[in-house]
From Swiss-Prot:
One of its GO terms (molecular function) is FMN binding. Belongs to the NrdI family. This is Protein NrdI. It comes from Corynebacterium glutamicum (strain ATCC 13032 / DSM 20300 / JCM 1318 / BCRC 11384 / CCUG 27702 / LMG 3730 / NBRC 12168 / NCIMB 10025 / NRRL B-2784 / 534). It comes from the Bacteria. The lineage of its organism: Bacteria, Bacillati, Actinomycetota, Actinomycetes, Mycobacteriales. GO terms for biological process: protein modification process. Transmembrane segments: none annotated. The gene is nrdI. Probably involved in ribonucleotide reductase function. SUPFAM superfamilies: Flavoproteins. InterPro entries: Flavoprotein-like_sf, RNR_Ib_NrdI_bac, RNR_NrdI.
């Protein structure tokens, strides 16, 4: 089971993913880095950007541009099996909005959302849910690995 994730320079999503103790690979932060190519089914974990704009009426771009670029590659998109989103519950209905958008566009389940860098309960729920439902999601079941 592979986790593909994006994390901004704050590393909140990175910290959460490392606590999952599952194989993972990070979508590059900058265009200078080599683009990521995925060749197996994966769960995408992404933060949500621009939280709270629905309350102000501004235009929202909740999916990070790096994630959009990654998913615009049809090959990468063909292997996505589920999406998880991070965010901030202070932003009301925008909390985890990136997950909703990706789920609809890629026609995959939006399986979980967590706040900021998640807590131990989030880690336990998501890890357990992914492990128990790996086959149903089209993922290869796998035992946790030691974090890198």
């Amino acid at each position: 089971m592979l986790i593909v994730y994006f994390s901004s320079a704050t590393d909140n999503t990175h910290r959460f993913v490392q606590k999952l103790d599952l194989p993972n690979v990070r979508i590059p932060l900058t265009r200078v880095e080599e683009p990521l190519k995925i060749n197996e089914p994966y769960v995408l974990i992404t933060p949500t950007y621009g939280g709270g704009v629905s309350m102000t009426g501004e235009n929202s771009r909740p999916v990070p541009p790096q994630v959009i670029r990654f998913l615009n590659d049809e090959h990468n998109r063909s292997f996505i099996r589920a999406v998880v989103a991070g965010g901030n519950s202070n932003f009301g209905s925008d909390f985890g909005l990136a997950g909703e958008i990706i789920s609809k566009k890629c026609k995959v389940p939006y399986v979980y959302r967590f706040e900021l860098m998640g807590n131990e309960e989030d880690v336990s729920i998501l890890r357990g849910g992914l492990t128990q439902n790996a086959q149903a999601l089209g993922l290869e079941p796998q035992e946790p690995v030691t974090s890198r």
